[in-house]
Structure formats: structure tokens, C-alpha cells
């Protein structure tokens, strides 16, 4: 059985302020028509269940906690939040990995985004997002 999928990578190394979404970057792999990426979101255009995997590497200019949360249509996805502590500013790299299953209801479209939270804004050196329609 073939599954629709998308895999995006952003390794531009941009700082992302707290409360903002992380740009998803370039499409590296894509199969099928029900998944697309634009700016800071992955667009899901067919009903069903989708497996989402996110891996992000980052540092921060200040000591503190960095939180990344997966959101579906602006609402946090339950269990898809990760926090790492930066103890040494600008030189310490940290990684957050998230996995979740989301659902798109019948006759609906949905947008997935990754939002920054915590006490310090990260500089994300790499974020990879994979989504597979199950």
C-alpha cells in the first residue's frame, strides 16, 4: 500500500521569537496530492489520520527553557510538546523530537505548525518534519 507523505527540512539557522511558528523549510520528499508545505505550515487536504515526526536542533542566545509544540489549526496537539534547557548560552546545542498522530475530519483541511514557547528564544539550526497519511 502506498501512503501520501511529505518530508521538509529547514537548516537556515534562523532565530525564532517565543510565540512564533518555525518555518518548515524546503520540501525534500513528497508523494501524493494531499500534503503540501507553505511558509510555516504543512497543509493536509484529505480526511484521515496522519503520523507526524519532528526533530529540531537548536541553541539560544540566553540561558533558559526552549519549548516546541505541534499545533493543528492553531490548537496544541495533546502530547506533542517538548522542552529542553539551555544551560550555556550560544554554545550548547539541544534537540527536541516529537511524534504524534493527528486526524483530519471529513470534508476538511488542516494546517500543522510548530510553535516556539519557553523562557528563551532559540536559533534553530535544523528542523526536519515528516508527515505520512496512514
Place the predicted regions along the sequence by residue.
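Extracellular jelly-roll beta-sandwich "head" domains, especially the C-terminal globular C1q domain
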Residues: 1-134
Amino acid at each position: 500500500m502506498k501512503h501520501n507523505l511529505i518530508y521538509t527540512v529547514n537548516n537556515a539557522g534562523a532565530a525564532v521569537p517565543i510565540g512564533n511558528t518555525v518555518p518548515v523549510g524546503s520540501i525534500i520528499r513528497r508523494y501524493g496530492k494531499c500534503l503540501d508545505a507553505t511558509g510555516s505550515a504543512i497543509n493536509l487536504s484529505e480526511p484521515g489520520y496522519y503520523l507526524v515526526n519532528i526533530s529540531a536542533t537548536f541553541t539560544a542566545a540566553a540561558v533558559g527553557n526552549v519549548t516546541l509544540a505541534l499545533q493543528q489549526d492553531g490548537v496544541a496537539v495533546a502530547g506533542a510538546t517538548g522542552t529542553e534547557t539551555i544551560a550555556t548560552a550560544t554554545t550548547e546545542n539541544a534537540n527536541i523530537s516529537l511524534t504524534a498522530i493527528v486526524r483530519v475530519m471529513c470534508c476538511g483541511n488542516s494546517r500543522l505548525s510548530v510553535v516556539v514557547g519557553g523562557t528563551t528564544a532559540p536559533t534553530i539550526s535544523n528542523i526536519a518534519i515528516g508527515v505520512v497519511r496512514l
